[in-house]
Design a protein with these regions (language model features):
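Glycine-rich phosphate-binding loop of actin/hexokinase-like ATP-binding domains
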Residues: 1-55
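ATP-binding/phosphotransfer module of carbohydrate and carboxylate kinases, centering on a glycine-rich
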Residues: 39-179
Length: 179
């Protein structure tokens, strides 16, 4: 079984079991934008309560917004963020390290439930090799000290070979499979 994570405006996902998309009850299995990652924030009024959702922690939109806020900019994009990261900008480094931690923590929660062999990171942000490396390092930092106590295995975290097109290819494949 594989889990595919697509990071963009939100956090998409798909669980593939024995070569088929796992649909389950309503067909929404694997839609990860709504994964709760901050239970304390759920008690806040809207829109602050939205910070409890994984999409608002690790989507490309959320991390570029965080970078813009740290720099006092009206907006930023992924190219600006990663260029600054490569140039050694401490704000970019901090934003991407927090992104990696949030992504890894969510993957660890998924792993406790699904015990998957592999998580493939897709979406536009996955075009940067640093993305998967940052997530993988953060996952290692969380998992490795606890490995002896974990009843589930350590998954591979890889870059999806379809990158930014992953969700479109997945949607087409699903449509053709259903037809």
């Amino acid at each position: 079984m594989d889990q595919y994570l697509v990071l963009g405006t939100g956090v998409g996902g798909g669980i593939v079991l024995d070569g088929h998309v796992w649909m389950v009850y309503t067909g929404g299995a694997g839609e990860l934008s709504g994964l709760l990652v901050d239970f304390n924030a759920m008690g806040l009024p809207f829109p602050q309560s939205m910070s409890a959702l994984w999409a608002n922690r690790i989507s490309a939109a959320s991390i570029t917004k965080a970078y813009a806020e740290r720099k006092g900019l009206e907006s930023a994009d992924g190219i600006m963020l990663f260029d600054a990261y490569e140039a050694g900008d401490e704000d970019a480094k901090a934003v991407l390290e927090e992104f990696g931690f949030q992504a890894a923590a969510g993957i660890m929660s998924l792993q406790a439930t699904l015990d998957l062999q592999r998580y493939a990171i897709g979406g536009g942000i996955s075009a940067r090799p640093e993305t998967t490396e940052i997530i993988r390092k953060a996952f290692d930092d969380l998992y490795d000290p606890l490995a002896a106590f974990m009843p589930y295995g350590k998954p591979e975290i890889v870059t999806c070979k379809f990158g930014n097109e992953a969700n479109l290819i997945g949607a087409l494949a699903f449509h053709l499979w259903k037809a």
